[in-house]
């Protein structure tokens, strides 16, 4: 079926509303496509954007989250809640452990955290706690890259680490998108008045811009539905493939970069000449664990993203690599 008769947006406008807040207006769409695409993009924006969050904390003199610290007005629960509000951005790394030390009366804010050159805090004035004259606070904060919302108890079980006294595992909300809504209005092209205008209202925490968030969401949506493109050209009648020439799923021809793995995992795979998803799924778990710098955590990440696409490790492919497949 040809799609040439379908209208595509001719106009995309970005209307700034405030800091990290914008309305993105796209028109025209065929009637009904405003809701179809608006709802899909909204769900992806809320659930699937990659961001950064504090995941573990260790405070000097603190055994558990229900403790109090002498000279600190807030209890540990309030300090942890405030710490979750700090917006971190990591450049070219997937995790980092940061140190916060301060004593003497006054407010402790996000800018008091000691940062390496490749870590940034978007809201440096964010309050963490208040100290009295004799107050002192010292802590280590682990920040990680992730997606969606991961409860602390789930992370603690999945990582299978030896429990350290005083190590507090946090519920992590990685999403950089704070709010998303969409509206569908009427649009007109020449004599047609039954068209849709899609208005996306997006607010982020500053790690990414609203425009970049939409671009990422669109790429995720395209990647997820690309598997259906294999049905194109089949016509109304089913034609079985010619014997001896197995058809290759187009998803397997996509680069591993499309899996949106962490930088560490992606670099480990490329070092082993694994450039395409088809290369990856033919490796076994044991083979990947022998890869330098690729540990159990990276392996679990790879298995999860493959499972989301209906794939597993250790699969066998005939006629791989296909003729003409370019290697970097």
From Swiss-Prot:
Upper lineage: Bacteria, Pseudomonadati, Pseudomonadota, Betaproteobacteria, Burkholderiales
Organism domain of life: Bacteria
GO MF term (any one): DNA-directed RNA polymerase activity
Record function comment: DNA-dependent RNA polymerase catalyzes the transcription of DNA into RNA using the four ribonucleoside triphosphates as substrates.
Gene name, Swiss-Prot/TrEMBL: rpoA
Organism: Bordetella pertussis (strain Tohama I / ATCC BAA-589 / NCTC 13251)
UniProt keyword list: DNA-directed RNA polymerase, Nucleotidyltransferase, Transcription, Transferase
Protein name: DNA-directed RNA polymerase subunit alpha
Record text on subunit structure and interactions: Homodimer. The RNAP catalytic core consists of 2 alpha, 1 beta, 1 beta' and 1 omega subunit. When a sigma factor is associated with the core the holoenzyme is formed, which can initiate transcription.
Any Pfam family matching the protein: RNA_pol_A_bac
